[in-house]
């Protein structure tokens, strides 16, 4: 299969590297209008075809990965799907739910693969955490807290929610096996840019009685990548900044015991376990799954419907930040998150 990578900046260049190692990929085509990005790739991957325009190779390629700025995702994906190409789009899949729905319909109508680059859904730790939740090892899930913070990198065309929150929304949807029924959000810009650089989102998963809180920031002194899951039996913390023991399971909890109008609490302080989880490179899993899906015709692990589910939350968060109101959503069917 001949696969193009459109947009060869920091992340697109990584796709070129991974695709160059996949046995099912006979040709990697690197596409970027900026020649200064193309030249280093030409030297590093001499077997790759490096060009500055999609027009030069659209008839040559069988599939493409789009790693350009978010607002260009939908027009590029639509053009490729209309040309009969399989497509994977980096996060966020599109800049609106209307665009996302159009791409999903276009792929379905033409029997083409549409995948979304939610890398963490291919992460071994996140998969392990999902399996623990699904298996009931944490008990009933009360809430999930996530923090994705750093000093930068400010983006030129989207705010911090559209830049960082797709990771956390996709993780939470995957771990809970559900999508939100309501979204509220607050954000602000502190550095004189037109886009919010700090934001807080609250997601209500009303169909399972859980909530999630997301904190994203480009304006924080420390780099934080953390997911906390609190259940009735145990609690789990996934800290992606740790070199070892990224997932820790805490045998801790509380239990109320009403007596004479008071509620004395019983606290449980158990041990901490960090399970051994064999790690693979998530991006390699992303690209391998996309290529294999395009060849076989099977549904990709993270398809367009899952990308649409994330965009719906992002758009609801934008509406909530603008209006100050909670936005109601219809949860996705089980088939979307299977």
Residue ranges and their predicted role:
Residues 28, 62, 142:
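Conserved acidic residues
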Residues 166-251, 276, 280-299, 334-338:
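Contiguous beta-strand/loop segments that form the cofactor/metal-binding neighborhood of enzyme cores
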Residues 157-161, 273-281:
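A short glycine-threonine-serine/GTX helix/turn-capping micro-motif
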Residues 63-70, 74-121:
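Beta-strand-loop-alpha-helix segment that lines the small-molecule cofactor/substrate pocket
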Residues 1-45:
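N-terminal Rossmann-like dinucleotide-binding module
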Residues 113, 120-194, 198-200, 247, ...:
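Predominantly a Rossmann-like dinucleotide-binding segment in NAD(P)-dependent oxidoreductases
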Residues 63-66, 289-338:
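C-terminal helix-rich "cap/oligomerization" subdomain common to oxidoreductases
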Residues 48-60:
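Short acidic low-complexity segments
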């Amino acid at each position: 299969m001949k696969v193009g990578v459109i947009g060869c900046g920091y992340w697109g260049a990584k796709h070129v590297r991974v695709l160059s190692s996949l046995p099912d990929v006979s040709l990697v085509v690197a596409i970027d209008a900026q020649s200064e990005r193309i030249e280093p790739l030409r030297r590093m991957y001499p077997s790759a075809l490096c060009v500055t325009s999609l027009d030069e190779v659209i008839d040559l390629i069988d599939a493409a990965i789009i790693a350009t700025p978010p607002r260009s995702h939908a027009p590029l994906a639509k053009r490729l799907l209309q040309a009969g190409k399989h497509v994977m789009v980096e996060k966020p899949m599109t800049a609106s739910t209307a665009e996302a729905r159009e791409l999903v319909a276009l792929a379905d109508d033409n029997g083409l693969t549409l995948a979304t680059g939610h890398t963490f859904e291919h992460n071994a730790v996140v998969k392990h955490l999902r399996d623990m939740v699904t298996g009931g090892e944490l008990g009933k899930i009360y809430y999930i807290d996530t923090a994705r913070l750093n000093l930068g990198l400010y983006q030129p065309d989207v705010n911090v929610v559209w830049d960082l929150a797709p990771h956390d929304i996709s993780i939470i949807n995957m771990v809970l096996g559900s999508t939100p029924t309501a979204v509220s959000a607050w954000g602000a810009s502190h550095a004189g840019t037109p886009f919010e650089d700090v934001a807080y989102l609250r997601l209500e998963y009303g169909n399972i009685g859980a909530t999630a809180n997301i904190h994203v920031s480009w304006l924080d002194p420390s780099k934080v990548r953390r997911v906390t899951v609190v259940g009735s039996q145990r609690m789990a913390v996934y800290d992606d900044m740790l070199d070892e023991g990224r997932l820790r399971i805490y045998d801790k909890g509380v239990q109320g015991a009403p007596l004479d109008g008071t509620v004395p609490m019983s606290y449980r302080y158990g041990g901490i376990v960090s399970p051994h989880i064999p790690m693979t490179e998530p991006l390699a899993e992303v690209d391998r799954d996309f290529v294999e899906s395009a060849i076989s015709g099977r549904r990709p692990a993270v398809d367009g419907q899952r990308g649409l589910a994330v965009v719906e939350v992002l758009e609801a968060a934008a509406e909530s930040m603008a209006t100050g109101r909670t936005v109601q959503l219809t949860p996705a069917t089980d088939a979307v998150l299977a």
